[in-house]
Amino acid sequence: RWESPLVTLNCAALSPSLIEAELFGHERGAFTGAAAGRVGRFEAADGGTLLLDEIGLIPLEAQEKILRAVEYGSFERVGSSQPQQVDVRIVGATNADLPGLVREGRFKADLLDRLAFEVVRVPPLRERAGDILLLAQHFASRMATELGRDEPPTFSREATRSLHRYAWPGNVRELKNVVERAVYRCDSPVIRELLV
């Protein structure tokens, strides 16, 4: 599948009412505003991989449809009864405790069983202190390039201490945002202060 499509969907960026249409597509007139039919992420990923970021936020109704698509390799677009055949590998990413969501009735146990073939647990950033400065330097370099700067800024000792003292509850995304803001605001080659 490495030569096949990799399609992503950030489930946190969509309202629950839009997730099903994004995943499975829709027919013209399926709902208000559906002026034309649209291919969903499952069809776009046919033969390849579909990455569902923040999979724990998907509503139960859409989870049921995902389960059927995984088990049977087919689904219907929103507003259609015509089955669409797909061969898609699903990768889910989440900060949520999916077994806990299953116990609370907010995630389907059988979908978790189907998706949990191989689970990779990435510890929170606060448990990977050695990664913090490396990631911060990477994000600073990328942001400097985006801003058209010749050299990426470095971090002062105090800024480095701040990076390591902070618990990073938002993990890598929060670190990236903090560093990008610091680079944007910094007009010298050294970042001296971080807003954390």
Please identify what each model-predicted range represents:
Residues 33-38, 63-84, 93:
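Substrate-gripping "pore-loop 1 plus following alpha2 helix"
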Residues 46-49, 65, 86-91, 108:
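Loop/turn-to-beta-strand initiation segments
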Residues 13-16, 33, 57, 77, ...:
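Residue-level preference for short helical/loop micro-motifs built around acidic side chains
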Residues 8, 51-52, 68, 88-94:
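Structural recognition of the conserved hydrophobic beta-strand(s) that form the central parallel beta-sheet
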Residues 1-32, 43-59, 124-130, 178, ...:
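Conserved post-Walker A coupling segment in P-loop NTPases
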